[in-house]
Design a protein with these regions (language model features):
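AMP-binding (ANL) adenylation modules
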Residues: 69-71
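Alpha-helix boundary recognition
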Residues: 9-12, 57-58, 112
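Residues at secondary-structure transition points
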Residues: 2-5, 29, 47-51, 89, ...
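Charged, gly/pro-rich active-site loop segments
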Residues: 1-2, 74-134
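Extreme N-terminal tail/first-helix region
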Residues: 1-16
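Short beta-strand segments
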Residues: 14-48, 54-56, 63-66, 75-78
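Charge-dense, helix-prone N-terminal extensions
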Residues: 8, 38, 133-134
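Amphipathic alpha-helical interface surfaces
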Residues: 7, 49-55, 78, 90-95
Length: 134
């Protein structure tokens, strides 16, 4: 499923996303985060030891809801799967790019020895207000 133009626009802007993964007991875990896209996938930068990373390593299903910071009714929901993780220097550069977009400066938090990873999300289904007729 190719990403909708509205989804790409929202993912390229400084809009927060809610990332939903499944805990080991099946309960959903929903957390706000920064989001990005390469035009084909959504990209979520995290630390490999975080619960969301452990969740998708076990069960790659993921839902990402992006809402415009200017208009909460401008949103896109992507249900999909994590199809790859990217680490190393690329993930480090990516978190700095995201931080520049969201706060105007390089990432300030200390990055531990585990480093950072990018969760690469392939969309299976998308929902936007336009697809609902709104």
């Amino acid at each position: 499923v190719p990403l909708d133009d509205d989804t790409i626009r929202l993912a390229k802007g400084p809009n927060l996303a809610t990332v939903v993964t499944l805990m080991p007991d099946g309960q959903p875990q929903a957390l706000p985060t920064w989001v990005d896209t390469d035009g084909e996938h959504l990209l979520v930068n995290t630390e490999p030891q975080r619960q969301r990373a452990r969740n998708v390593a076990r069960d790659p299903r993921i839902t990402v809801l992006i809402q415009s910071g200017d208009n909460a009714w401008d949103w896109a929901e992507v249900r999909g799967r994590v199809v790859d993780t990217v680490g190393g220097d690329e993930a480090r550069r990516h978190i700095d790019e995201l931080s520049q977009r969201y706060v105007g400066a390089d990432y300030q938090r200390e990055i531990g020895p585990e480093g950072r990873i990018i969760l690469v999300v392939a969309p299976d289904r998308e929902l936007t207000p336009a697809k609902l007729g709104g």
